[in-house]
């Protein structure tokens, strides 16, 4: 059965419509409501002029709203594989242990919404199997501490908690792929611009926060491995150039990194899995900046 995908685009945004919805800086609705009575109290000529102006404004707004209706453009899905001029040059003589990884953290949310994947023959197939058959040997998955609001609603982005990471890790292992677990130590995305402390850790002193981070890492990682994942690497933080878990002071940041690393080593020893520890910084082309960060990490 042929499926259609609908793409919607807003053609324009009109200030009048925004104001009518209560988002404007002034009460335009009140002004519009007082124009007509004021016009009736004036002389006929002035009233007609004011009434005409008000009517003209209403007409303009009505016309404008018609022009900004959202139109749907329908694209039909192809019924057979399509040839594309996409070619990636192979890299010769790679070692067997060279990491060829893909981050598919949002895959469960995609599948729940009806997304399916097809192989090069146009056949529907498990995306994990497709990746493994095409040389991928590592799957990366992000983990947020508590990516839900007080009503249990996900913040979005795949809602990547430990349970979802465990399921992704299990499916990756089914096809012989290792898992890289990317701990953000936040309830949502952490990056150079924001390293928000998880809700449960707010107000903690660094000693308590370090212990909370160690315990969370140990329990989460154990749960992922118990689900059947073959964990080969763990990231202690995500893009932590400017902070981690709400901390920007380097002494405190090192303490958190040490706590996370200790937890990984403990789980590695308890499960028998050989797990590498990674720290994740951005702007690696800035050699001077990265070397400065490395010195900070090494300080006692």
Regions found by a protein language model. Give the residues of each.
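Hydrophobic helical h-region of N-terminal Sec-dependent signal peptides
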Residues: 10-14
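Residue-level signal for mature regions of secreted extracellular proteins and peptides
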Residues: 16-17, 48
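N-terminal, intrinsically disordered, polar/charged segments of Gram-positive cell-envelope systems
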Residues: 27-79
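Alpha-helix termination/capping residues and helix-transition junctions
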Residues: 17, 96, 133, 226-228, ...
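Active-site cleft segment of glycoside hydrolase catalytic domains centered on the general acid/base Glu
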Residues: 154-155, 159-166, 190-300
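Bacterial N-terminal signal peptides that target proteins for export
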Residues: 1-9
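C-terminal motif of bacterial Sec signal peptides marking the signal peptidase cleavage site
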Residues: 19-22
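N-terminal substrate-binding region of glycoside hydrolase catalytic domains
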Residues: 69-167, 171-173, 178, 184-212
